[in-house]
Regions:
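Short, basic, helix/turn surface patches
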Residues: 67-78, 187-192, 284-286, 366-371
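Short internal beta-strands
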Residues: 160-164, 325-326
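Acidic, His- and aromatic-enriched active-site or binding-groove loops in soluble protein domains
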Residues: 64-72, 177-203
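Hydrophobic mid-domain F-helix/FG-region of cytochrome P450s
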Residues: 146-153, 167-177
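Cap/lid and interdomain-hinge subdomains that line or gate substrate/regulatory clefts
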Residues: 131, 135, 139, 162, ...
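TRNA-binding/sensing appendages of the translation machinery
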Residues: 1-80, 85, 141
């Protein structure tokens, strides 16, 4: 007889009770929040043709795909590492004629080729919303506000929104602080590390003020305004300031203008969501462009949440009373109690024990009695 194995590939795990049910409840709560704001749910497939999927991807994301050859079509398929580009494909094709702004929500598993340092999972749940057709201040404010509300609905407190300007170095290097493509990459790396000495060694002293323009929103924004002496960034800064003003009573606000992690395709603004009691980010979002069928680009804003840490921490886990139904119980009474919200477990033999089966009550006639 072959020995049974419970070994799973590195970065994958089973979700067991009560975490699986808690995860479903949290997912439902977040999606209900998005639906209450008019975001209609779509559900793209886990697998797509590699060339179709990568055609909408940028940066290092293309190297994070799990690929295999379809034995039927002999074409290379890929497992999605992110749902956002799939939403873009749907918006540009199946829903290209739908009225704009188009509000869509989604939830599904994504798979990574490699695990991260903070989260070793290679498969994780991604829930999000995309507002397609505009990246105005009003649209961005709605997206950030809805993201905060969704996290609050999931049970998080002490939420912080950290704003960033993903394409800031691109804008500056093409204007008042010129850099070659290679130099720009080096400057981004030094800014990521907040390494003032490294910037000086590169001869990029003009970028040094960006390291100081980080922290509580009002102070950091004031430093960015001082840095922007020629008003090249004025419209972007005004936009981010307006978004912040619209949500200032809903979350703590910070600004890190050069933060790039997780912002491979966002442009003029991005944001990261943090919560009290958790080390890593709860989600990210921002503005971006979607390629259309006719070769143009369509503006959009959106966010993605990764609720795995919340589920692991027991969020949305709500212990419920469980009613044991003995052999020969009153089926009408049991049905009526289930309609009231009771969870029942029916005995299948005389040896079934209520406590062993995790029950908190047993049915005595027509009434539940605590064990």
């Amino acid at each position: 007889m072959q020995k049974l194995s419970n070994l799973l590939p590195e970065g994958f795990h089973d979700s067991l009770p009560p975490h699986a049910e808690a995860g479903s409840r949290l997912e439902r709560d977040v999606l209900d929040t998005l639906a209450s704001h008019g975001y209609a749910r779509v559900s793209p497939p886990l697998v797509e043709y590699e060339d179709v999927l990568t055609g909408r991807m940028t940066g290092s994301a293309k190297s994070d795909l799990m690929r295999f050859v379809d034995p039927i079509s002999q074409r290379t398929l890929a497992l999605r590492p992110d749902v956002t580009m799939q939403i873009g494909r749907i918006a540009a094709t199946s829903l290209s004629e739908a009225a704009r702004p188009l509000r869509l929500s989604y939830s599904g598993q994504v798979l990574k080729l490699r695990s991260g340092q903070l989260r070793p999972e290679r498969s994780r749940l991604q829930i999000g919303a995309e507002l397609i057709g505009t990246d105005s201040v009003a649209a961005a404010s709605e997206i950030v506000s809805v993201a905060i509300e969704a996290l609050s609905r999931a049970g998080l407190t002490g939420i912080t929104v950290d704003f960033t300007m993903p394409d800031l170095v691109d804008v500056l290097s093409a204007g008042p602080l010129p850099l070659s493509a290679a130099q720009a990459a080096e400057v981004r790396s030094e800014l990521d590390m907040k390494d003032a000495g490294g910037l000086t060694d590169l001869g990029a002293v003009g970028y040094l003020p960006l390291i100081e323009a980080t922290g509580p929103f009002d102070d950091a924004m004031a430093k960015m305004r001082s840095f922007d002496s020629d008003n090249l960034l004025a419209s972007r800064l005004d936009g981010i300031a307006a978004i912040a003003a619209n949500i200032k009573d809903k979350a703590n606000l910070t600004l890190d203008p050069t933060e790039r992690h997780g912002f491979e395709y966002q442009n003029w603004f991005g944001f990261t969501l943090f919560a009290e009691g958790f080390v890593g980010a709860m989600g990210r979002g921002g503005s971006y462009e979607i390629p259309t069928a006719d070769g143009d680009m369509e503006n959009a804003v959106g966010f993605s949440l990764y609720p795995g840490p919340l589920i692991d921490a027991g969020f949305s886990a709500k212990p419920k009373d469980v009613l044991f139904l003995p052999l020969g119980h009153d089926e009408e009474a049991a049905s009526s109690l289930r309609a009231e919200g009771w969870r029942t477990v029916a005995a299948l033999s005389d040896s079934d024990d209520a406590k062993t089966l995790g029950c908190t009550h047993h049915l005595d006639g027509e009434k539940p009695v605590a064990i």
